[in-house]
Amino acid sequence: MDNLIGKTLDGLYTIQELIGAGGMANVYKAVVSAPGGPVPEGTVVAVKVLRQELMHDADLVRRFKNESKAISLLNHPNIVKVYDVSVSENLQYIVMECVEGMTLREYLNERGGKITSRETVHFIAQILRALDHAHRNGVVHRDIKPQNIMLLDNGQLRMMDFGIARISRAENQIQNGKKAMGSVHYISPEQAKGEETDPKSDIYSVGVMMYEMLSGRLPFDADDMVEVARKQIRDLSLIHI
Protein backbone atom coordinates (compact mmCIF):
# COMPACT_ATOMS: atom_id res chain seq x y z
CA MET A 1 0.00 0.00 0.00
CA ASP A 2 1.16 3.53 -0.78
CA ASN A 3 2.57 4.97 2.44
CA LEU A 4 1.09 8.41 1.68
CA ILE A 5 -2.52 7.17 1.83
CA GLY A 6 -4.06 8.53 5.02
CA LYS A 7 -1.19 10.94 5.62
CA THR A 8 -1.92 14.63 6.25
CA LEU A 9 0.49 17.12 4.68
CA ASP A 10 1.17 20.33 6.61
CA GLY A 11 -1.85 19.57 8.80
CA LEU A 12 -4.13 20.52 5.89
CA TYR A 13 -4.33 17.96 3.11
CA THR A 14 -5.34 14.39 3.97
CA ILE A 15 -4.37 11.99 1.18
CA GLN A 16 -7.21 9.62 0.21
CA GLU A 17 -6.16 7.71 -2.89
CA LEU A 18 -3.70 7.55 -5.76
CA ILE A 19 -5.34 8.79 -8.97
CA GLY A 20 -2.37 9.08 -11.31
CA ALA A 21 1.25 7.97 -11.56
CA GLY A 22 3.93 9.44 -13.80
CA GLY A 23 7.65 9.22 -14.25
CA MET A 24 8.26 12.38 -12.24
CA ALA A 25 5.38 12.56 -9.78
CA ASN A 26 2.30 10.84 -8.40
CA VAL A 27 -1.08 12.53 -8.16
CA TYR A 28 -3.39 11.88 -5.23
CA LYS A 29 -6.96 12.80 -4.40
CA ALA A 30 -7.01 14.56 -1.04
CA VAL A 31 -9.41 16.51 1.13
CA VAL A 32 -8.74 19.77 2.95
CA SER A 33 -9.11 18.52 6.53
CA ALA A 34 -8.58 21.73 8.52
CA PRO A 35 -9.42 25.43 8.25
CA GLY A 36 -6.85 28.09 7.54
CA GLY A 37 -5.66 26.90 4.15
CA PRO A 38 -6.03 28.55 0.74
CA VAL A 39 -9.30 26.68 0.05
CA PRO A 40 -12.20 25.89 2.41
CA GLU A 41 -12.17 22.86 4.70
CA GLY A 42 -13.81 19.86 3.04
CA THR A 43 -12.71 20.79 -0.49
CA VAL A 44 -11.51 17.87 -2.59
CA VAL A 45 -8.17 18.66 -4.24
CA ALA A 46 -5.47 16.94 -6.29
CA VAL A 47 -2.02 16.78 -4.73
CA LYS A 48 0.92 16.22 -7.07
CA VAL A 49 3.90 14.82 -5.15
CA LEU A 50 7.41 14.52 -6.56
CA ARG A 51 8.47 10.88 -6.32
CA GLN A 52 10.65 10.37 -3.25
CA GLU A 53 13.41 8.54 -5.13
CA LEU A 54 13.82 11.56 -7.42
CA MET A 55 14.40 14.14 -4.69
CA HIS A 56 18.16 13.87 -5.27
CA ASP A 57 17.79 14.69 -9.00
CA ALA A 58 18.39 18.43 -9.20
CA ASP A 59 17.00 18.71 -12.75
CA LEU A 60 13.73 16.99 -11.88
CA VAL A 61 13.34 19.02 -8.70
CA ARG A 62 13.90 22.16 -10.79
CA ARG A 63 11.26 21.05 -13.31
CA PHE A 64 8.79 20.31 -10.52
CA LYS A 65 9.34 23.69 -8.89
CA ASN A 66 9.09 25.32 -12.31
CA GLU A 67 5.68 23.71 -12.84
CA SER A 68 4.35 25.19 -9.62
CA LYS A 69 5.76 28.60 -10.51
CA ALA A 70 4.33 28.45 -14.02
CA ILE A 71 0.81 27.52 -12.94
CA SER A 72 0.79 30.03 -10.09
CA LEU A 73 1.10 32.81 -12.68
CA LEU A 74 -2.08 31.70 -14.43
CA ASN A 75 -5.80 32.10 -13.76
CA HIS A 76 -7.94 30.89 -16.63
CA PRO A 77 -11.04 28.65 -16.93
CA ASN A 78 -9.20 26.30 -19.30
CA ILE A 79 -6.14 25.83 -17.07
CA VAL A 80 -6.10 23.67 -13.93
CA LYS A 81 -5.94 25.97 -10.89
CA VAL A 82 -3.10 25.69 -8.38
CA TYR A 83 -3.96 26.40 -4.75
CA ASP A 84 -0.77 25.76 -2.82
CA VAL A 85 2.89 24.78 -3.18
CA SER A 86 4.87 23.42 -0.27
CA VAL A 87 7.50 21.05 1.12
CA SER A 88 6.41 18.79 3.98
CA GLU A 89 8.64 16.15 5.60
CA ASN A 90 10.95 16.29 2.56
CA LEU A 91 8.02 15.92 0.14
CA GLN A 92 7.72 18.47 -2.66
CA TYR A 93 4.07 18.89 -3.61
CA ILE A 94 1.58 21.04 -5.48
CA VAL A 95 -2.09 21.31 -4.48
CA MET A 96 -4.37 21.77 -7.47
CA GLU A 97 -7.98 21.77 -8.53
CA CYS A 98 -9.28 18.20 -8.68
CA VAL A 99 -10.71 17.75 -12.17
CA GLU A 100 -13.13 14.87 -12.78
CA GLY A 101 -13.24 13.60 -16.33
CA MET A 102 -11.02 11.96 -18.94
CA THR A 103 -8.00 13.10 -20.87
CA LEU A 104 -8.43 14.29 -24.42
CA ARG A 105 -6.25 11.31 -25.38
CA GLU A 106 -8.77 8.90 -23.85
CA TYR A 107 -11.63 10.72 -25.58
CA LEU A 108 -9.93 10.45 -28.97
CA ASN A 109 -9.11 6.78 -28.42
CA GLU A 110 -12.77 6.03 -27.62
CA ARG A 111 -13.69 7.50 -31.01
CA GLY A 112 -11.09 5.73 -33.06
CA GLY A 113 -8.70 8.68 -32.99
CA LYS A 114 -10.82 10.96 -35.19
CA ILE A 115 -13.56 13.45 -34.31
CA THR A 116 -15.78 15.84 -36.23
CA SER A 117 -14.64 19.23 -37.46
CA ARG A 118 -17.23 20.83 -35.14
CA GLU A 119 -15.76 19.11 -32.08
CA THR A 120 -12.25 19.88 -33.24
CA VAL A 121 -12.98 23.60 -33.48
CA HIS A 122 -14.70 23.50 -30.06
CA PHE A 123 -11.65 21.91 -28.43
CA ILE A 124 -8.93 23.80 -30.29
CA ALA A 125 -10.56 27.18 -29.54
CA GLN A 126 -10.42 26.42 -25.80
CA ILE A 127 -6.80 25.29 -26.00
CA LEU A 128 -5.80 28.43 -27.89
CA ARG A 129 -7.56 30.67 -25.38
CA ALA A 130 -5.68 28.96 -22.54
CA LEU A 131 -2.37 29.31 -24.37
CA ASP A 132 -3.04 32.95 -25.18
CA HIS A 133 -3.45 33.58 -21.45
CA ALA A 134 -0.30 31.61 -20.61
CA HIS A 135 1.78 33.34 -23.27
CA ARG A 136 0.56 36.79 -22.18
CA ASN A 137 1.83 35.89 -18.71
CA GLY A 138 5.23 34.83 -20.01
CA VAL A 139 4.69 31.05 -19.81
CA VAL A 140 5.46 28.66 -22.68
CA HIS A 141 4.03 25.18 -21.93
CA ARG A 142 6.36 23.12 -24.21
CA ASP A 143 4.49 19.82 -23.76
CA ILE A 144 1.11 20.31 -25.42
CA LYS A 145 -0.47 16.92 -26.18
CA PRO A 146 -3.87 15.23 -25.67
CA GLN A 147 -2.59 13.42 -22.56
CA ASN A 148 -2.06 16.79 -20.83
CA ILE A 149 -5.58 18.08 -21.41
CA MET A 150 -8.56 17.05 -19.29
CA LEU A 151 -12.09 16.95 -20.70
CA LEU A 152 -14.93 17.62 -18.27
CA ASP A 153 -18.43 16.20 -18.65
CA ASN A 154 -19.71 19.60 -19.81
CA GLY A 155 -17.27 19.71 -22.74
CA GLN A 156 -14.91 22.18 -21.12
CA LEU A 157 -11.18 21.51 -21.29
CA ARG A 158 -8.53 22.03 -18.61
CA MET A 159 -4.86 22.24 -19.57
CA MET A 160 -2.46 20.68 -17.08
CA ASP A 161 1.09 19.41 -16.56
CA PHE A 162 3.35 22.42 -16.89
CA GLY A 163 6.32 20.32 -15.75
CA ILE A 164 8.65 21.49 -18.52
CA ALA A 165 7.10 24.92 -19.02
CA ARG A 166 9.47 27.79 -19.56
CA ILE A 167 9.06 31.06 -17.71
CA SER A 168 9.99 33.30 -20.61
CA ARG A 169 10.42 36.56 -18.73
CA ALA A 170 13.95 37.85 -19.14
CA GLU A 171 14.87 37.71 -15.46
CA ASN A 172 13.64 34.13 -15.06
CA GLN A 173 14.57 32.41 -18.30
CA ILE A 174 15.07 28.68 -17.96
CA GLN A 175 16.97 27.08 -20.79
CA ASN A 176 17.78 23.45 -21.28
CA GLY A 177 20.87 23.49 -23.48
CA LYS A 178 20.63 21.09 -26.38
CA LYS A 179 18.25 18.64 -24.71
CA ALA A 180 14.95 18.18 -26.56
CA MET A 181 12.01 18.68 -24.20
CA GLY A 182 8.43 17.56 -24.83
CA SER A 183 6.61 14.54 -26.26
CA VAL A 184 8.21 13.64 -29.54
CA HIS A 185 5.06 13.29 -31.70
CA TYR A 186 3.91 16.80 -30.80
CA ILE A 187 7.10 18.82 -30.37
CA SER A 188 8.05 21.61 -32.75
CA PRO A 189 11.12 21.36 -35.02
CA GLU A 190 13.07 23.72 -32.76
CA GLN A 191 12.26 21.53 -29.75
CA ALA A 192 13.38 18.44 -31.66
CA LYS A 193 16.70 20.20 -32.30
CA GLY A 194 17.02 21.17 -28.63
CA GLU A 195 16.83 24.86 -29.52
CA GLU A 196 15.17 27.73 -27.68
CA THR A 197 11.38 27.68 -27.60
CA ASP A 198 8.80 30.46 -27.67
CA PRO A 199 4.99 30.67 -27.92
CA LYS A 200 5.12 29.53 -31.56
CA SER A 201 6.39 26.15 -30.33
CA ASP A 202 3.12 25.62 -28.45
CA ILE A 203 1.09 26.70 -31.49
CA TYR A 204 2.92 24.11 -33.61
CA SER A 205 1.97 21.40 -31.09
CA VAL A 206 -1.67 22.52 -31.25
CA GLY A 207 -1.47 22.19 -35.03
CA VAL A 208 -0.28 18.60 -34.66
CA MET A 209 -3.23 17.85 -32.38
CA MET A 210 -5.65 19.49 -34.79
CA TYR A 211 -4.26 17.40 -37.66
CA GLU A 212 -4.68 14.27 -35.55
CA MET A 213 -8.26 15.11 -34.56
CA LEU A 214 -9.33 15.70 -38.16
CA SER A 215 -7.40 12.92 -39.89
CA GLY A 216 -7.25 10.21 -37.23
CA ARG A 217 -3.49 9.90 -37.52
CA LEU A 218 -0.32 11.69 -36.50
CA PRO A 219 1.53 13.71 -39.14
CA PHE A 220 4.81 12.01 -38.22
CA ASP A 221 5.19 8.51 -36.81
CA ALA A 222 7.80 5.77 -36.68
CA ASP A 223 8.77 2.85 -34.46
CA ASP A 224 11.80 4.78 -33.22
CA MET A 225 11.28 8.02 -31.28
CA VAL A 226 14.51 9.50 -32.63
CA GLU A 227 13.21 8.97 -36.16
CA VAL A 228 9.96 10.74 -35.27
CA ALA A 229 11.99 13.73 -34.08
CA ARG A 230 14.01 13.68 -37.31
CA LYS A 231 10.79 13.71 -39.33
CA GLN A 232 9.56 16.73 -37.37
CA ILE A 233 12.69 18.57 -38.50
CA ARG A 234 13.03 17.53 -42.13
CA ASP A 235 9.66 16.30 -43.48
CA LEU A 236 7.24 19.21 -42.97
CA SER A 237 6.62 19.51 -46.71
CA LEU A 238 5.43 15.89 -46.88
CA ILE A 239 2.30 16.31 -44.73
CA HIS A 240 -0.98 15.44 -46.47
CA ILE A 241 -4.48 15.11 -45.04
Task: Name what the model sees in each region.
Residues 123-124:
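Activation segment signature within eukaryotic-like protein kinase domains
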